[in-house]
Amino acid sequence: SIRLFYRARTNAPSVTQLQDVVNIRNVLFPSVGNPDLLQDYTHSIIARYQFTNSAKRTSFFANLFLQNTQNYITNASYLITQDSAISSSIILRRGARLTKPVNLDGYWSARSFFTLGLPLNFMKSNLNLNAGVTYSKIPGLIDNVENTSNSYNYNVGAVIASNISEYVDFTVSYSANFNTIKNSIQPELNNNYFNHVASFQLNLLSKTGWLFQNDLNNQMYRGLTNGFNQDYWLWNMAVGKKFLKDQKGELRLSVFDLLKQNQAISRTATETYIEDVQNDVLQQYFMLTFTYKLRNFGSGAANKARRTQ
């Protein structure tokens, strides 16, 4: 089946974007609002194709998205050439860049995503392959000169999910993203970077109620700022026992980040700058949990009411 959609929407500027107040929380990148901002208008076209073969248990999905925005709310960046006192408590330092939201036309975005699913009968599993391409054209102003940031993202992935039994379940997955950024007037901001995620999940349950869960992930980043090109493992594990009547009770011991390598790295690419951020995240911890399942809660009263009618 094929489906086509058209959608239109508006986006009003936020209160922060409209306030004519200087924010110096980041002294290198101070910002100020713009009370003259207009709302933007976005037009979207969406195309979807779906094919399934129930007999062979295969499927194929294709999605295409195209978007254009008028009066796009973007950023203008201005270099501070000398120390400037806005007030007794606010001083813009020489070398900083002041950012201000403005309206510009010329924003475009296109995205495609494809998925193929098929069975792996020899190992009682299903295989899903996916791939996609994303393009975005973002206008901006740098020292009153219009800059266009062209961003390209290419991604591929694969997932093998088992369908063996209720006692054995595993999932193996891999995804890779390659990104490239090209700017019209700031070639020093042009950049290529790559990241991938590989994971393995295993769930085992015995007929006597013992359970084991394993979740292992590897994440790698390349092409980021020095110090951000990381390669680390995140390993979570749990063991437990189901007990009581009908195995309604469960006692489980879990450990998060067994190798103490958990990290959080992100990249923000805008029309005026590229920023790499590493945040503090929760490190290794252990957790003991008890769970009791309340099955058919209230069913006795409902059955009695039906019998009396």
Predicted features along the sequence, with ranges:
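Exposed, low-structure sequence patches enriched in small/polar residues
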Residues: 1-309
